């Protein structure tokens, strides 16, 4: 059930260049949310619109959220300190489908945040990509307690496989009998991941990152085309069957 929470900030730490990890003491939100869902955060009274942020972790009653400072709203959010309280609406949207077997998580950039929550929930390996060793280092540390095996690619080849996650994906898929592929990141990356997964007849779910205003399906600002017509990322997603959106 969607609720409005006013919760204390436990930490708001910078973990990489322009990337922050926000930790909230929110046991009820943690208990009722599912991997792949998101929240709408009210930055302050000075901002009319909330900011949609994916839920990255829900362990021990704490909700963790990763965000990149890209504008005035997230810049102000990065200045919020432990001990203050945050207005959060959630959990919103439809998350990943519960399933058994070994799942492969494939992500890049901030798209790795909702996949971290999936790694806490499912038995999973992760294939993660970034620009360089520094960008992927903190993600590897976050996934280590939850993922059985971590595969890495970097654009500059400084660590892991040189190239993109789609370059490494065929070899990773050949290593094990995965039951499904879950992916989140840039749309062009997800399209490539979905193509390779579906060629192997593997179920594939994609999680879209879209700008949105209301987060409740009223404003239509986050609508996308699917084989079933226009759908709202905030309400019908953000997780979709890849066959429905990349037909």
Across the structure, where does each feature detected by a protein language model lie?
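Ferredoxin-reductase
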Residues: 2-84, 131
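Local cysteine-cluster metal-coordination motifs and their immediate loop/turn environment
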Residues: 114, 187-188, 209-238
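Short, Lys/Arg- and Gly-enriched loop/turn segments at beta-strand edges
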Residues: 47-56, 93-101, 234
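FNR/FR-type flavoprotein reductase catalytic core
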Residues: 75-208
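Short, basic/aromatic-enriched C-terminal tail that caps enzymatic domains
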Residues: 1-3, 230-247
């Amino acid at each position: 059930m969607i609720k409005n929470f006013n919760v204390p900030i436990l930490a708001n730490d910078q973990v990489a260049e322009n990337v922050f990890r926000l930790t909230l003491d929110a046991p009820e939100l943690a208990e009722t949310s599912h991997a792949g869902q998101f929240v709408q955060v009210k930055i302050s009274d000075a901002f009319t619109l909330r900011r949609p942020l994916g839920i990255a972790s829900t362990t021990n009653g704490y909700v963790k959220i990763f965000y990149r400072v890209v504008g005035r709203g997230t810049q102000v959010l990065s200045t919020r300190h432990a001990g203050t309280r945050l207005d959060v609406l959630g959990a919103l949207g439809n998350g990943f489908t519960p399933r058994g077997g070994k799942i492969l998580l494939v992500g890049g950039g901030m798209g790795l945040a909702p996949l971290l929550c999936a790694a806490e929930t499912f038995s999973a390996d992760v294939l993660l990509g970034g620009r360089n060793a520094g960008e992927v280092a903190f993600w590897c540390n976050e996934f280590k307690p939850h993922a059985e095996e971590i595969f890495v690619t970097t654009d500059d080849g400084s660590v892991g496989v040189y190239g993109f996650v789609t370059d490494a994906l065929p070899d990773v898929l050949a290593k094990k009998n995965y039951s499904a592929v879950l992916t989140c990141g840039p749309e062009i990356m997800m399209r490539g991941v979905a193509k390779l997964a579906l060629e192997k007849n593997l179920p594939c779910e994609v999680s879209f990152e879209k700008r949105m205003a209301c987060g409740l399906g009223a404003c239509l600002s986050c609508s996308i085309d699917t084989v079933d017509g226009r759908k709202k990322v905030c309400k019908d997603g953000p997780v979709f069957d890849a066959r429905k959106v990349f037909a």
